[in-house]
Amino acid sequence: MVNVDAVRKDFPILEQVVNGRPLVYLDSAATSQKPRQVIDALVRYYETSNANIHRGIHTLATRATDQYEAVRGKTASFLGVSNPEDVVFTRNTTEAINLVARAWGDANLGAGDEIVLTLMEHHSNIVPWQQLVGRTGAVLRYAGITPGGTLDLDQVRGLIGP
């Protein structure tokens, strides 16, 4: 079981009190809060390696590119992706969803194809698919939630077709 208090301690911003209660941040699709380890790594990077990647041969550019590609390799390994070049970094979830809807969706979905979302989606995971439906003629379906507030898995199974 995850120790929520221990995890919260890794996030300096969550030490704040708002309206008399500990801060809770639930809008991470566009901007996620950073744990201390990430903040420290960013500071080290800005102090030692800050440069454009894949754009130069000088020391800092080479160092930054090497670090960037090393992270791509580690990410591929962690995700079980055989080719690190298949890993694409985006600035946030919102940008990633838009990229998938535009690049993959436009190339692979057409009239009558079905897209299944849930009624629990963040706004950033609804609009790109609505726009895709408008461009392609695909059909958008929504899976509901149970009275207990969880995803209705039976409804999901019924919405996913051949």
Region spans (language model):
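Pyridoxal 5′-phosphate
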Residues: 1-162
